């Protein structure tokens, strides 16, 4: 089906472009959300009459989106999840989880604005793209961790696989083992003690 785009649509075209798309995509997404019109002769004439108004609305919406983008660009949200020692999550972090974390931080978005290619399945920092307007995209960072303390360590850039507590415990164990097993001490067995007494 041929449609006239009423706004920029990613991977499809700019406002005013006439593009051919599958019927289901046109009916269920583009037409339903008022992102396009069927490319009939009447609608082409209607679009030419609406063009100046649409462009003015788009510029105003883009300006508002730029203000919102400045407020949330570069934010870091922390999402706490259970995970294995290797860092694999038991489950995943989806668009809804990211929306909830941003909402707790005072940012209200729709699920269509959070562009996540696939759910997050491991601990770490993940770059998330947010489309606040069809022509304005920004990035936020989602830090997925097992605890707040681990999230702080991830944000500082520390290696979470080698925990500091584990390293300290290992150092203490080595020190204790060194005191217990003195390498300079002679091996005193009852047989060597008896031999030294006979002399």
UniProtKB/Swiss-Prot annotation:
Which GO terms label this protein's molecular function in UniProt? rRNA binding; structural constituent of ribosome
Which Gene3D superfamilies does the UniProt record give?
Answer: Ribosomal protein L9, C-terminal domain (3.10.430.100), Ribosomal protein L9, N-terminal domain (3.40.5.10)
The biological process GO terms on file are: translation
Bilayer-crossing residues are: none
Q: Which residues form a coiled coil?
A: none
Could you tell me which SUPFAM superfamilies the record lists for this protein? L9 N-domain-like, Ribosomal protein L9 C-domain
Q: Where is this region: Disordered?
A: 149-199
Compositional bias (Acidic residues) at which positions? Answer: 181-191
Tell me the keywords, alphabetical order: Ribonucleoprotein, Ribosomal protein, RNA-binding, rRNA-binding
Chain's role: Binds to the 23S rRNA.
- HAMAP family linked: Ribosomal_bL9 (MF_00503)
Give the family, as the similarity comment puts it.
Belongs to the bacterial ribosomal protein bL9 family.
Q: What is this protein called?
A: Large ribosomal subunit protein bL9
């Amino acid at each position: 089906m041929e449609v006239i785009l009423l706004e920029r649509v990613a991977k499809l075209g700019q406002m005013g472009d006439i593009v051919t798309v599958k019927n289901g995509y046109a009916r269920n997404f583009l037409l339903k959300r008022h992102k396009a019109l069927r490319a009939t002769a009447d609608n082409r004439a209607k679009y030419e009459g609406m063009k100046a108004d649409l462009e003015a609305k788009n510029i105003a919406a883009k300006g508002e989106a730029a203000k919102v983008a400045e407020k949330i660009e570069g934010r870091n949200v922390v999402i706490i999840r259970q995970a294995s020692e290797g860092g694999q999550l038991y489950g995943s972090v989806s668009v809804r989880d990211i929306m909830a974390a941003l909402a707790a931080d005072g940012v209200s978005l729709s699920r269509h604005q959070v562009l996540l290619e696939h759910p997050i399945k491991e601990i770490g920092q993940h770059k998330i793209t947010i489309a606040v307007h069809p022509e304005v995209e920004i990035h936020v960072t989602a830090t997925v961790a097992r605890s707040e303390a681990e999230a702080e360590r991830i944000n500082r850039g520390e290696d979470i696989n080698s925990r500091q507590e584990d390293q300290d415990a290992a150092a203490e164990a080595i020190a204790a083992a060194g005191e217990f097993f003195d390498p300079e001490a002679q091996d005193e067995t009852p047989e060597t003690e008896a031999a030294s007494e006979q002399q």
